[in-house]
């Protein structure tokens, strides 16, 4: 595959995001809908796919102590700046939160279980009329903008008649045409200058981690760091990762560099690699190459599991990605990277997702621990063999199988998780 296609996919899948991306996506949608209509808000209706609804259900809104779909939508309309994309709530003020709290009776949330992939629609009714937006497939991918039933913007190639996926989604799916040896060959041989941009994720996510070490969220990262000696890069990796996620899910007004639409995925696929780099005094080039591998494996799995799923994509998909990156950074061969992925597939695949919330750092810690264990096993010639569980004869089929566990495998599980969450909130 042309290396420029791979690089473009990496660039497209990587972007800054403030807070968990599902409430950010809802806020962006309502911000754009209000932007085109203006006036005094009478009602906001949000229609979302079940996965997006679940992930935003109990997640903190950046810069506030508020949580959930309703507040995300209201704040998007009240103070959101759609030009900032997933950082649309960057300018939030206390008075905006106070205003939103008085308007909770003006919002309706509907779950649309018939959509395929990520979907959020915002219909904002004001004294000036109705503004409407639809976001599809990616958290910031606005495909339709209407004002009083007149189309102001409609994205071309939004639907592909053969499979109902956007052209952008099809581009990322090209990753799944690659064999693992081709992926590793790209990582080894691509010009460093062409992938140096990946280090931007390190700078952004490290700042978020430092914020989390102040004791945000459940304080897991801070707790782990307290027991970490100077040369223990594994515990340091857990601490960096968990503190960044602690900060993110608790509403810290500090962005993460997302990948495959998720800040948590972006954190897990990068910060453990930074921990190794720092403790072993490695150079930036090998770090960038390991991040490229981590990202690509994560993207590969997510193309089969979906952007949002019943399993914890952070621990499973991103965890598998970073396990490959860890093995690479520790000098692993192609075969050892392959065996690392097999070990991950055999371990925590199937860990459930209960949405973006304070438990995310706990699951992330499990994912990072499993990633290091899988790599260490592979580097010591310990591997789960083919035809054992979901490990297939080819590593590509094994990665596909990881995704299949989520979709279609756990679709009914996802529905039940959402039912439990809704019942528990009453």
From Swiss-Prot:
GO molecular function, one term: L-cysteine desulfhydrase activity
InterPro entries: Ser_deHydtase-like_asu (IPR005130), UPF0597 (IPR021144)
Superkingdom, taxonomy of origin: Bacteria
UniProt record similarity statement: Belongs to the UPF0597 family.
Record-level GO BP terms: L-cysteine catabolic process to pyruvate
Name by which UniProt lists this protein: UPF0597 protein CLK_1197
Species of provenance: Clostridium botulinum (strain Loch Maree / Type A3)
One Pfam family here: SDH_alpha
């Amino acid at each position: 595959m042309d290396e420029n296609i791979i690089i473009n996919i990496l660039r497209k899948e990587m972007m800054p995001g403030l807070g968990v991306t599902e409430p950010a996506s809802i806020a962006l949608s309502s911000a754009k809908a209000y932007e085109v209509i203006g006036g005094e808000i009478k009602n906001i209706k949000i229609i979302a796919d079940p996965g997006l609804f679940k992930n935003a259900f109990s997640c903190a809104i950046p810069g506030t102590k508020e949580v959930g779909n309703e507040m995300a939508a209201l704040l998007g309309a009240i103070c959101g700046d759609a030009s900032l994309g997933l950082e649309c709530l960057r300018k939030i003020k206390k008075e905006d939160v106070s205003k939103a709290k008085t308007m909770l009776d003006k919002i309706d949330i509907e779950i649309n279980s018939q959509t395929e992939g990520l979907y959020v629609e915002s219909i904002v009714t004001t004294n000036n009329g109705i503004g409407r937006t639809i976001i599809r497939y990616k958290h910031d991918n606005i495909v339709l903008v209407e004002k009083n039933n007149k189309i102001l913007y409609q994205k071309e190639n939004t639907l592909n008649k053969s499979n109902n996926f956007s052209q952008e989604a099809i581009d990322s799916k090209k990753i799944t045409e690659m064999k693992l040896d081709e992926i590793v060959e790209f990582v080894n041989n691509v010009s460093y200058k062409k992938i140096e941009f990946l280090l931007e994720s390190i700078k952004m996510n490290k700042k978020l981690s430092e914020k989390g070490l102040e004791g945000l969220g459940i304080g897991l990262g801070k707790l782990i760091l307290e027991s970490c000696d100077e040369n223990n890069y594994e515990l340091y990796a857990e601490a960096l990762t968990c503190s960044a996620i602690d900060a993110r899910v608790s509403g810290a007004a500090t962005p993460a560099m997302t990948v495959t639409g998720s800040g948590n995925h972006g954190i897990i696929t990068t910060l453990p690699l930074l921990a190794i780099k720092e403790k072993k005094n490695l150079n930036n080039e090998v770090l960038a190459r390991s991040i490229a591998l981590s990202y690509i494996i994560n993207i590969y799995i997510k193309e089969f599991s979906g952007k949002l799923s019943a399993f914890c994509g952070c621990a499973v998909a991103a965890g598998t990605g970073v396990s490959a990156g860890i093995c690479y950074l520790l000098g692993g061969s192609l075969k050892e990277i392959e065996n690392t992925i097999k070990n991950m597939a055999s371990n925590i695949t199937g860990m459930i997702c209960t949405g973006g919330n304070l438990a995310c750092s706990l699951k992330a810690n499990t994912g990072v621990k499993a990633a290091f264990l899988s790599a260490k096993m592979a580097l010591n010639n310990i591997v789960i063999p083919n035809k054992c569980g979901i490990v297939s004869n080819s590593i590509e089929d094994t990665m596909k199988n990881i995704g299949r566990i989520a979709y279609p495998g756990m679709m009914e599980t996802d529905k039940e998780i959402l039912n439990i969450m809704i019942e528990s909130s009453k």
